[in-house]
C-alpha cells in the first residue's frame, strides 16, 4: 500500500502543476525579483509563484487517504496540522507579495508571531491528545550525552520549528535547490522512521518525497514555477516537526545542513555589516555568493545537492544508532 500512496502523491502533484501554472499566469501571480540580486535572475521576473500549493494539496489528499485506511495514523494528523499551518502563513505572505507587485509580504514580526503560534499549538495538541512522547532531552550526536531541558523543551520546539521553517525559505532562491534538498531530506527521514518503528511518520515522509518528485521537473532550471513561501515555510516546519516526533532533533542539523549553512551565511553577513561596515560574502544567502564569483546556477544547485546528500547520510546514521 505504501507504493500506492507514493504513486498517488506523485501523480496528483505532477498533474496539478501544469493546471496551476496557466492559472497563476492569467492572474499575474508572478515572482518579483530583487533588483540588487544577480542580474542573471532578472529574466525570472514574472515566473509563477505559489507553486507549493500543488504539492501541499497532494500531501493533504494522500494523507487523508492514509488516515482512512491505516490504523494508528495519529502522527499524520499532527503533521498535517503543521503542514497546513505553516503553508497558510506562506500563502498569505505570497498573496500579499503578488498583489502588491513587490518582494515584501508579511512583516518579519507578523510572520514570526504566526509561526510561533503554530509551534505552540503543535505542542499543546501533542500533549492534550498524547500524540507525541516528548523526551524533553536533547541527545548529542556521537556521544551518550543527553541534555535535559525539562520545561525549556517547549522553547526549543518553537525555536526549532520557526528556525527551520525560515531556513528552507532562505534556501529557496535557486531553481530546484530547496526542492532537491527536501527530497534528499525526506528520503533520509523515511528510512530513519521505518528503522525506528515509526511507520506512520515513515509513510508521511514517503508522501512528502513523492509529492516533491512530482514538482521537481517543473522547478529545476529553467523553472516554470516557484514553490514560494507557501511551499518553503511548510517544508521547513515539517522537517523540524519530524525530527522532534522521532526524538532525533539534532539529526536535522546534518540532514538539513545546507539549510543551516544558508541561514548562518545571512546571520554572519548582517552581523559583519552592522559591526564593521563590511560584508563577508558578495551576497547572502551564500548560494548567491557562488553565483557572483562565476558559478552557474546549475553548478551551485548540484554541488549543494551533493553536500546535502553526504550530510544527509551522516544524519541518517546518527538517527539510527
UniProtKB/Swiss-Prot annotation:
Topology term for the membrane: Multi-pass membrane protein
Example GO BP: peptidoglycan biosynthetic process
Gene Ontology molecular-function annotations: metal ion binding; phospho-N-acetylmuramoyl-pentapeptide-transferase activity
Taxonomic superkingdom: Bacteria
InterPro entries (UniProt xref): Glycosyl_transferase_4, PNAcMuramoyl-5peptid_Trfase, PNAcMuramoyl-5peptid_Trfase_CS
One of the record's GO cellular component terms: plasma membrane
Keywords assigned: Cell cycle, Cell division, Cell membrane, Cell shape, Cell wall biogenesis/degradation, Magnesium, Membrane, Metal-binding, Peptidoglycan synthesis, Transferase, Transmembrane, Transmembrane helix
Cofactor(s) essential for the protein: Mg(2+)
Reactions accelerated catalytically: UDP-N-acetyl-alpha-D-muramoyl-L-alanyl-gamma-D-glutamyl-L-lysyl-D-alanyl-D-alanine + di-trans,octa-cis-undecaprenyl phosphate = Mur2Ac(oyl-L-Ala-gamma-D-Glu-L-Lys-D-Ala-D-Ala)-di-trans,octa-cis-undecaprenyl diphosphate + UMP
Keyword Transmembrane helix part of the UniProt annotation: yes
Transmembrane segment boundaries: 1-21, 50-70, 76-96, 112-132, 140-160, 176-196, 200-220, 225-245, 250-270, 300-320
Enzyme Commission numbers on file: 2.7.8.13
Position of the signal peptide: none
Subcellular location as annotated: Cell membrane
Pathway: Cell wall biogenesis; peptidoglycan biosynthesis
Similarity-based family: Belongs to the glycosyltransferase 4 family. MraY subfamily.
PANTHER family xref list: PHOSPHO-N-ACETYLMURAMOYL-PENTAPEPTIDE-TRANSFERASE, PHOSPHO-N-ACETYLMURAMOYL-PENTAPEPTIDE-TRANSFERASE HOMOLOG
Task performed by this protein: Catalyzes the initial step of the lipid cycle reactions in the biosynthesis of the cell wall peptidoglycan: transfers peptidoglycan precursor phospho-MurNAc-pentapeptide from UDP-MurNAc-pentapeptide onto the lipid carrier undecaprenyl phosphate, yielding undecaprenyl-pyrophosphoryl-MurNAc-pentapeptide, known as lipid I.
Protein name: Phospho-N-acetylmuramoyl-pentapeptide-transferase
